[in-house]
């Protein structure tokens, strides 16, 4: 479980001091949850996120435990280092909006015909309760030839999950190489 510290002071000087000590500034918020300003050690946070198997993961702050999902993050444009992260605290049975990653499997037929695989949409916006949240959308790209694509409407439908993106948006496709 990922452990962090609650920030007592939310001043700019306090944030700079925490960043200097190797902390990542974070906010936890959600429906029915009071906003919490906190900080996590940067390297363990990144390592934990890369190894987690589900979108929802637990974090511990002092004696409180929250089930959260990464809602938004900010990176330094020059160094590409994480600066800040917003975590959405989820409550069982309460619908929220999430962004679910798209993963693909297989090798498209179109690659042999001088095509390039193009991932147009890396995340799909959905609305559901946390217990119905899919970990990812898996797309089989093997049958795709040049100038063919998979649209949002072609994705696997999950029960109790509403896809918020428009049906005609391309998720992944094979385009002709120039």
Curated annotation (Swiss-Prot):
GO terms for cellular component: cytosolic large ribosomal subunit. GO terms for biological process: translation. Keywords: Ribonucleoprotein, Ribosomal protein, RNA-binding, rRNA-binding. It holds the Pfam family Ribosomal_TL5_C. The gene is rplY. This is Large ribosomal subunit protein bL25. Belongs to the bacterial ribosomal protein bL25 family. CTC subfamily. Part of the 50S ribosomal subunit; part of the 5S rRNA/L5/L18/L25 subcomplex. Contacts the 5S rRNA. Binds to the 5S rRNA independently of L5 and L18. The keyword Ribonucleoprotein applies. GO terms for molecular function: 5S rRNA binding; structural constituent of ribosome. InterPro entries: Rbsml_bL25/Gln-tRNA_synth_N, Ribosomal_bL25/Gln-tRNA_synth, Ribosomal_bL25_b-dom, Ribosomal_bL25_C, Ribosomal_bL25_long, Ribosomal_L25_dom, Ribosomal_uL5_bac-type. It comes from Helicobacter pylori (strain J99 / ATCC 700824) (Campylobacter pylori J99). This is one of the proteins that binds to the 5S RNA in the ribosome where it forms part of the central protuberance.
